[in-house]
Amino acid sequence: AVTVASQKVFDAFYSNDDRKALMHGPTFMGNPLACAVALKGIEIFEREDYMSKIHRITEISHREMDGFTDPRIREVRIMGGCTCVDVYDPSTLEGFQQFAYERGVFSRPFLTCMYTMMPYIIKEEELIQIYDVMKEWFRR
């Protein structure tokens, strides 16, 4: 495999020590198998009208989360299958991962963001369950 980079980029990742060297050259090349899989994914995405599924998720997300406020919340953002509840203080989310897990939801906050990235095949009741757990965290 060949990876093309400027000398500056090359120098930043080059090392004779395998623990420090960039070992992802093949990650960035046009792997034929990866390209074939990507094309098949696009075909399925279009054939099964995933855009309508994304719109449905977005509508449910807005219905469930628009207007949800708490003094600890900076903002709630929704785009497609992603929802982010951004808080002012990261300590607000300490313990949320276990709290959510105990209620059947796998979620891990990142810094000040409690977020979801919904699979496009999610059922409405599953989506509502996730949002209920998120809201319950702030109401406890």
Residue ranges and their predicted role:
Residues 1-140:
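Conserved N-terminal phosphate-binding loop of PLP-dependent enzymes in the Aspartate aminotransferase
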